[in-house]
Structures are given as C-alpha cells and as structure tokens.
Regions:
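Intrinsically disordered, low-complexity regions enriched in proline, serine, glycine
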Residues: 3-6, 31-36, 59, 72-73, ...
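Catalytic cores of histone-lysine modification enzymes
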Residues: 14-25, 34-134
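Short, compositionally biased
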Residues: 78-93, 166-184
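Short interface patches used for recognition in eukaryotic signaling and trafficking proteins
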Residues: 5-11, 55, 136-143
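C-terminal folded domains that constitute the principal catalytic or ligand-binding module
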Residues: 114, 122-123, 128-164
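Cys/His-rich Zn2+-coordinating "finger/knuckle" modules used by eukaryotic regulatory proteins
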Residues: 1-41, 157, 170-185
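Hydrophobic, well-ordered secondary-structure elements that form the walls
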Residues: 117, 153, 176
Length: 185
C-alpha cells in the first residue's frame, strides 16, 4: 500500500498477488501503519439498490480511486464438502487453496454489502486474498479493491469467474449487457 492506503502503482489486477498486512506480531502502530488497510474495515460508502433484471446490486456513493479498498466478502467459512450439500449456492466464494483442504465463504445467511455485488464482464473490482491476523493460506480475507477509478454512482461489479459460469449457465446467463460479454448465451 502507499501512504494513502491505496494499492501501489503497478499492482497486477489481472493476477493479484496475496497481501500480508501487519498484525499484532509487528512492532508497528495499529492506528498509523499503512500496511493495515483491510483490517480497518470499510471506508468507501456504497448503497444496495434494486436493479432491473439482476436482483440487488451495489453502487458507489463516493469516488473511489484505483487501488482503493472497497469492501470484504464475508460469511460463514465452510468446507467444499459442506458447500456441495447446501441447497442455495448463490453466495459461495471459493477460496481456491492449491494445497490440502479447500474451503469457501458462504454469505447466504451471514454476510455484508459485498454479497449483493453483481457479476460484470468489465469489472471495476478485483478480489484479492489478504492475510491479517494469521498466515494460514487456507483462510484468506477476500478484499475487493477498485481495479480502476470508480465514480460516484457507478455500479460495482467483479468477474465471478469461469468456474461459476460453467455451473450456472444452465440456469441463467450474464446480464451485464456489454458488447464483450463472455457469458451471455
């Protein structure tokens, strides 16, 4: 992060690296350390609203700079095996651990504003794995950062990914409406 708590210039939004923030093991000041962004919580103001055709959505109520932290995808952490047993898989976020057990975040019953952010084939948010209190690679925080400048009133969206659409295309298609849409029919 830079001195304004923004991801540094040159951050790779197409293949984001993991971020390890300072924690209680560091000697830094918890209130003034620039490497404690996600753990300070949401600062960008957003609004949940009813969309046309896509249920709920989220829009920005303030300008958000490229690289700015917007929100964290939170919910119940469950194993992939448990996720397979659940009937409603609409709010699952796969944590994609390459080694050992795999888990996901289920925001169906427990979550925040982030669960209402819709898919976009031209996303303005990028999910980034962030570690704050530990370094257990199975359990990252999923932080949403602005992948470009976001203006007040812009609709927030991130790419749900091909794995999501392989499963869901049987039930619905993408409604982003963009010419370069990857997942409509």
């Amino acid at each position: 992060y830079d001195s304004n708590s923004i991801l540094k210039e040159g951050f790779d939004f197409s293949d984001p690296p993991m971020i390890f923030e300072c924690n209680d093991m560091c000697g830094c000041n918890i209130n003034s350390c620039n490497n404690r962004v996600v753990q300070h919580g949401i600062t960008a103001r957003t609004q949940v609203y009813k969309t046309y055709g896509m249920g709920w959505g989220v829009k920005a109520l303030v300008d958000i700079p490229k690289g700015g932290f917007v929100c964290e995808y939170v919910g119940e952490i469950i194993s992939d095996a448990e996720a397979e047993q659940r009937e409603n898989d609409s709010y699952l976020f796969d944590l994609e651990n390459r080694d050992g057990d795999t888990f996901c975040i289920d925001a169906n019953k427990f979550g925040n504003v982030t669960r209402f952010i819709n898919h976009s084939c031209d996303p303005n948010l990028t999910p980034v794995k962030v570690f704050t209190a530990h370094q257990d690679l199975r359990f990252p925080h999923i932080a949403m950062f602005a992948s470009r400048e976001i203006k007040k009133g812009d609709i927030l969206g991130f790419d749900y990914g091909e794995k999501f659409w392989v499963i869901k295309h049987k039930y619905f298609t993408c409604w982003c409406g963009l010419e370069k849409c990857k997942y409509s029919k």
